[in-house]
Amino acid sequence: ALSSAASDVYKRQVRSINTSLKEGKLVPDVPIGLQALFRSSVQPYMISWYTYNPQEIIKKLKVPVLILQGDKDMQVSVKDAELLKRSQPSADYHLIGNMNHLMKTCDTMDQQKQMATYTDPALPLHKDVLILIEKFVSKP
């Protein structure tokens, strides 16, 4: 696990990179530990997505919506998912315990342990994901 000081440095680096991307600026020198999230090949994609407000987009949808949120997601917070649900009250919302951003089982918010789940293609989806998707798409 990261020490408190290292965790603070990591958080500052992430905030700084995100600020630059939100301003439409590429970040050429990304620390090695953050390359998986902010490598140069994904930065243009992230910049383009920062121009959208998910709450405004979901509010306009006239189709059924499924929101699956893991309580161990380090990229999208539970609060963010709840804001989506509030913006689209008819959405089918599920908070799934011990699930991360990749919808894999994960019982920690420790960055290193999380990254291990990101890079292991053998790990299956969380057991509830397919059940909830099947129920959602099977609704009349």
Give, region by region, the residue ranges found by the protein language model:
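Short beta-strand/loop motif that positions the catalytic acidic residue
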Residues: 61, 67-69
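Active-site nucleophile elbow and catalytic-triad environment of alpha/beta-hydrolase enzymes
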Residues: 41-57
